[in-house]
C-alpha cells in the first residue's frame, strides 16, 4: 500500500466537478472534487450514499427542503429513493461510498443526519477498539481507535483496505 492524500491528489479544476472511481460495482467508491460555486443536480437513487468530506464544505440537499451543510471531517448517509444533490460555494473534495438498503448498518448512523466518524468510537487506555459501520457478504466498513502504543499483529483478511486517518497519527506496515 501507499500513503496518499485524497484532497491533494484530487485538487479542484476551476468551474468543474471531477469524479474518480476507485472501486466499481456494488458498494462503489468515488472521489469527487467540486470547484467553488459548482453543483450536482438532485437525483433519486435506490441506495444510500455515504458522503465523507475531506476538504472544504458541501451542502447536501433534497427537493423537499432537506439541507445539510458538511465541513471537512463530517459525513452524512443520504436517504434512499429521494432526490439528493450536492452544491458548494467554497469548493469541496469528498468520498462517496454506495451502501445498499440491504446492507447491515450500525444503529449509530441515522440517514440524513450529519456526524463525524471520529466521534462514534471512543479511545481507551491500552486498548484497540473497532466498530462496524456497514457490511454485507463482500464488504465491511469499520472504524478503529488505537491508544498510544497499541496496534494489531500482522494478519491477512480477504479483499483490500482503504484507510482514512480520522485523528492523530500512526504507522501502517
Name each model-derived stretch.
Residues 1-28, 71-72, 91-93, 98-140:
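A short, N-terminal "cap"/entry segment at the start of jelly-roll beta-barrel domains
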Residues 47-63, 158-173:
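Glycine- and acidic-residue-biased ligand/ion/polar-headgroup-sensing regions
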Residues 86-90:
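Asparagine-centered strand-capping/turn motif at beta-strand->loop junctions
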Residues 12-18, 25-45, 126-129, 140-157:
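Conserved short histidine dyad/triad with adjacent acidic residue
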Residues 64-81:
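Short acidic-glycine-tyrosine-enriched beta hairpin
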Residues 39, 74-75, 83, 151:
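Residue-level marker of beta-strand positions
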